[in-house]
Amino acid sequence: MMVSVPSIAAVSYLNTIPFIYGIRHEGNFRADLLLSPPSECTKNYVEGRADLALLPAAAVPSLKSTEVITEYCIGAVGPVRTVVLLSDGPVSEVRRVFLDPHSQTSVQLVGYLAAHRWKIAPEWYSLDDYEQLRHAQEGDAFLLIGDKVFDHEEKFRYKYDLAAEWQAATKLPFAFAVWVARKGTPYE
């Protein structure tokens, strides 16, 4: 069964512009693009609104009948600037972390780094309102992802780039998001 005009869910951040440009300007390829934050990409794919998707890497293992379809990804070897932990004190003094709800992968990554690199065990909270950033208390840190980092990074004394922290801890690159399709879906 061929998908005549595929629906493609992709992240609506600056780092996907090369992918979006390629999809929109490939002369022989038509697709409906669904651009949204990472968590919404997953929802669009899971609920069947997208045939192909750029999904948070952390979401893929839980998706049945899904396969990674290319080596292209949103990944990094070193700093990315758009996936950060912000605080007014050093990470060793962090007691509470407020988590950006837009990326399951980044939430898992900061949890790994807290336990294995920084050796801290903070309390975890959802960052339900970005106004919370203005009311940080001593020991608070904020996981932010995407373009919104640019609006807030200068308001804090400490900024930990999670991709750089991952590489320092593991000596490996990090994949934040990968291209997937349902098994059996033609995608070339």
Predicted segments — roles?
Residues 15, 106, 110, 175:
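Catalytic-loop motifs flanking and including active-site residues across diverse enzymes
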Residues 1-76, 92-93, 138, 165, ...:
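N-terminal hydrophobic or amphipathic helices and topogenic motifs
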Residues 22-25, 68, 112-113, 156-159:
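Short, glycine/charged-enriched secondary-structure capping and boundary segments
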Residues 72-131, 160-167:
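A conserved helix-loop-strand patch within extracytoplasmic ligand-binding domains
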Residues 22, 82-91, 96, 174-188:
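A bilobed periplasmic-binding-protein/Venus flytrap-type ligand-binding module shared by bacterial periplasmic
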Residues 126-188:
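Pocket-lining segment of extracytoplasmic ligand-binding domains
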Residues 53, 97, 142:
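Receiver (REC) domain switch-region micro-motif
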Residues 11-13, 100-102, 145-147, 182-183:
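Structural motif
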